[in-house]
From Swiss-Prot:
GO biological process: translational elongation
GO MF terms held by the record: guanyl-nucleotide exchange factor activity; translation elongation factor activity
InterPro entries to which the protein is assigned, alphabetical: eEF-1beta-like_sf (IPR036219), EF1B_bsu/dsu (IPR049720), EF1B_bsu/dsu_GNE (IPR014038), Glutathione-S-Trfase_C_sf (IPR036282), Transl_elong_EF1B/ribsomal_bS6 (IPR014717), Transl_elong_EF1B_B/D_CS (IPR001326)
Function: EF-1-beta and EF-1-beta' stimulate the exchange of GDP bound to EF-1-alpha to GTP.
Keywords: Elongation factor, Protein biosynthesis
Name of the molecule in the record: Elongation factor 1-beta
Subunit structure: EF-1 is composed of 4 subunits: alpha, beta (1B-alpha=beta'), delta (1B-beta), and gamma (1B-gamma).
Gene Ontology CC, one term: cytosol
Annotated family: Belongs to the EF-1-beta/EF-1-delta family.
Amino acid sequence: MAVTFTDLHTADGLKALEQHLSGKTYVSGNAISKDDIKVFAAVPSKPGAEFPNAARWYDTVAAALASRFPGKAVGVNLPGGGAASSAAAAAPAAKDADEDDDDLDLFGDETEEDKKAADERAASKASSKKKESGKSSVLLDVKPWDDETDMKKLEEAVRSVQMEGLTWGASKLVPVGYGIKKLQIMLTIVDDLVSVDSLIEEHLTEEPINEFVQSCDIVAFNKI
């Protein structure tokens, strides 16, 4: 039976997570899974000392993410000074999460069938000698200047950036405190055509979009 967590940015929400993780290493099962990634994305920062189980779990998932995605972070802000390498705020709505499950598949339990299928695909590509450009799924946090920023116009400005190889996906406004919300948005890129660093530095944080956008953080970057 599926477990539901709500308001993980609040003490009550973290209390429910703390109770669920009592005696457990992961949210479900004996290995890290999509369930852990979805819940991790909904926790704004590392839980405090009053939530030892949740804090331990948070560090475990953060370490797994860091090893999966090595390299220098791009403008990542860590509220609360936690030890984790990066933390998403609230996850997209459940419906969007289900619809975009493939995009958010940062981890998955790889079976023998999966490995065999992957080997067969690789062999097929090699034999046909077709060169296909890879794709990546990216999760961005887009932060406004203040609580007076029109978030609808901010999202419109972000989505106005169009280029070959870039596809915008699901999005959600996430509370970050003091009445301020940030935009959390998915995008898919063709690796040979789009650089996320250039997208942020040359488009999303430049005029005229920087009228609404203060900064952008890469929350997750996953090869498809």
